[in-house]
């Protein structure tokens, strides 16, 4: 494996062990400069990133690297200058006389080999790298497009709304507010909007930014007495894509500035798309005037992917990686990893890296070994299909036998379809198994019931609450 492959496998392992914030802000922008005689040098772009890695993630990083390469590793974090372009060099010498060896195999274009420059006056040597990372600079990531987004019942409404905004910015759904748990594709959709807008009209001014970067830019502008420049930057754009807005809650100065930025853009028919991990009304300490503005347009819930969507995501990821993953392994991962897309893709990365390092075929046994720590944390007592039927029937106040009967009245049909959906999601039962369990129904009837519930929980808040309540009881029973 070359440096790029080692670092990719390391990030895949860390992706499921760290918070989204630490992964995106500290790990993802970093790069593996060299690995020689058990010494790994990690390049970062700022003192803050260096401090964050060293204080919070050094041990997990060291352990993940060691697992990938198969031997103990010492990690040193170096400040990198990401703004200047340098020609690749075969090696470089640090101030202590040790050498950083460049990758002996070809490296992707955005990570050419490093070269040293004189000190920056802080006593630190600076490694200059051309790492054209869109996420790092607040620009758009070209990999996040609508064509690379897997659409399923859990995100179909969000996808359609984002596509409508991208095709007609400044028109309907302004603002568009996306909310949902970590790793469900909200950031992907924000970037997809920006990329499509620019594909259609390169002259449109689009800005993607996290709420944390907005806050940091404001703080720096105040400190440098450049608030007018800050306002010029944020209020002279056509499409503002702001991620994780919940982090401005409780920050009075940031909320004040964003309030006026929002008003300026909205009154000029500029489009604003916002993401959050919760709906506006659930963001505590968010000013009421901002909350009301977020509710002016369309609010869309992004749900965790269902089994079929998880399977499609894994197949697309395997194709993107140019790795053959047998169907039974895809099914195994789709059933085991249910929380979010990021963990799902990260798990496939880990399995592929584990198989490559051990020169082993990708099998269920290989996947189980590669994900031993993750699956160990998720290990739960199995719950029987009969127990799920009992929980569903108790929730709706009917008998289990009514779920199996041919009764087609609505007060039984909906609970029966909910039972089909939960049996498909929470157990490894096939459609045929579920049909047999529910009075010998055809597998196509079961498929229809599952799809109907998966579709309706996106638009029917009452049904969504009922399914969530039943799922909570299932989790409690599992322990």
From Swiss-Prot:
Q: What spans are recorded as compositionally biased (Polar residues)?
A: 86-99
Any one GO CC term of this protein is:
cytoplasm
Question: Mind telling me which SMART domains this protein's record contains?
Answer: AAA, Bac_DnaA_C
Matching Pfam families, A to Z? Answer: Bac_DnaA, Bac_DnaA_C
Q: What are the recorded Gene Ontology BP terms?
A: DNA replication; DNA replication initiation; regulation of DNA replication
Stretches the record annotates as Domain III, AAA+ region:
139-355
Annotated region (Domain IV, binds dsDNA), positions in chain: 356-479
Q: Which Gene3D superfamilies match?
A: 1.10.1750.10, 1.10.8.60, 3.30.300.180, P-loop containing nucleotide triphosphate hydrolases
Q: Which residues bind ATP?
A: 183, 185-187
Instruction: Write the record's keywords in alphabetical order, separated by commas.
Output: ATP-binding, Cytoplasm, DNA replication, DNA-binding, Lipid-binding, Nucleotide-binding
Record carries keyword Coiled coil:
no
Annotated region (Disordered) at 86-106
Which GO molecular function terms does the record list? ATP binding; ATP hydrolysis activity; DNA replication origin binding; lipid binding
Looking up InterPro entries in the UniProt record yields: AAA+_ATPase, Chromosome_initiator_DnaA, Chromosome_initiator_DnaA-like, Chromosome_initiator_DnaA_CS, DnaA_C, DnaA_dom, DnaA_N_sf, P-loop_NTPase
Highest taxon above the source species: Bacteria
Domain I, interacts with DnaA modulators: where is this region? Answer: 1-71
Stretch list, region Domain II: 71-138
> Where does this one sit in the cell?
Cytoplasm
Role of this protein: Plays an essential role in the initiation and regulation of chromosomal replication. ATP-DnaA binds to the origin of replication (oriC) to initiate formation of the DNA replication initiation complex once per cell cycle. Binds the DnaA box (a 9 base pair repeat at the origin) and separates the double-stranded (ds)DNA. Forms a right-handed helical filament on oriC DNA; dsDNA binds to the exterior of the filament while single-stranded (ss)DNA is stabiized in the filament's interior.
Q: What is known of its domains?
A: Domain I is involved in oligomerization and binding regulators, domain II is flexibile and of varying length in different bacteria, domain III forms the AAA+ region, while domain IV binds dsDNA.
Subunit info?
Oligomerizes as a right-handed, spiral filament on DNA at oriC.
According to its UniProt record, which protein family does this protein belong to? Belongs to the DnaA family.
Record-given protein name: Chromosomal replication initiator protein DnaA
Q: Which gene encodes it?
A: dnaA
């Amino acid at each position: 494996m070359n440096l790029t492959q080692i670092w990719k496998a390391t990030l895949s392992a860390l992706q499921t062990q760290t918070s989204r914030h630490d992964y995106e802000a500290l790990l993802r922008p970093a790069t593996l400069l060299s690995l020689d005689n058990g010494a790994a040098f990690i390049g970062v772009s700022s003192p803050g990133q260096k401090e964050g890695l060293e204080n919070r993630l050094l041990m997990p990083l060291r352990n993940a690297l060691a697992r990938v390469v198969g031997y103990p590793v010492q990690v040193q974090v170096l400040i990198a200058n990401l703004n200047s372009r340098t020609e690749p060099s075969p090696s470089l010498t640090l101030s202590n006389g040790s050498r950083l060896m460049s990758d002996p195999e070809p490296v992707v274009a955005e990570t050419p080999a490093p070269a040293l420059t004189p000190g920056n006056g802080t006593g630190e040597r600076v490694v200059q790298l051309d790492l054209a990372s869109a996420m790092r600079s607040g620009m758009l990531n070209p990999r996040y497009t609508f064509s690379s987004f897997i659409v399923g019942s859990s995100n179909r409404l969000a996808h359609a709304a984002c596509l409508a905004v991208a095709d007609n910015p400044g028109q309907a759904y302004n603002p568009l507010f996306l909310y949902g748990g970590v790793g469900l594709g909200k950031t992907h959709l924000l970037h997809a909007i920006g990329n499509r807008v620019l594909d259609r009209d390169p002259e449109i001014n689009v800005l993607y930014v996290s709420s944390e970067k907005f806050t940091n830019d404001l703080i720096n502008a105040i400190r440098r007495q450049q608030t007018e420049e800050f306002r010029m930057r944020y209020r002279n754009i056509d499409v503002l894509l702001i991620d994780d807005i919940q982090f401005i809650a409780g920050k009075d100065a940031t909320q004040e500035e964003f309030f006026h930025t929002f008003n300026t853009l909205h009154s000029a028919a500029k489009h604003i798309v916002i993401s959050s991990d919760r709906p506006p009304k659930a963001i505590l300490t968010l000013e009421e005037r901002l909350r009301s503005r977020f509710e002016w347009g369309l609010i869309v819930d992004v749900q965790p992917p269902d089994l079929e969507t998880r399977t499609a995501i894994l197949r697309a990821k395997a194709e993107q990686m140019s790795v053959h993953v047998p169907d039974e392994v895809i099914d195994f991962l789709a059933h085991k990893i249910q929380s979010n897309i990021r963990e799902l893709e990260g798990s496939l990365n880990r399995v592929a890296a584990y198989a490559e390092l051990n020169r082993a075929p990708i099998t269920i046994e290989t996947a189980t070994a590669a994900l031993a720590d993750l699956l160990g944390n998720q290990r739960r007592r199995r719950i029987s299909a009969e127990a799920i039927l009992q929980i569903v029937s108790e929730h709706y106040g009917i008998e289990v036998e009514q779920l199996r009967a041919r009764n087609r009245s609505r007060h039984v049909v909906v609970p029966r379809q909910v039972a089909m959906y939960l049996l498909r999601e929470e157990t490894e039962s096939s459609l045929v198994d579920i049909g047999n369990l529910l009075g010998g129904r055809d597998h196509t009837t079961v498929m229809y019931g599952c799809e109907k519930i998966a579709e309706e929980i996106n638009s029917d808040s009452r049904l969504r609450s009922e399914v969530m309540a039943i799922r909570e009881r299932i989790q409690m029973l599992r322990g």
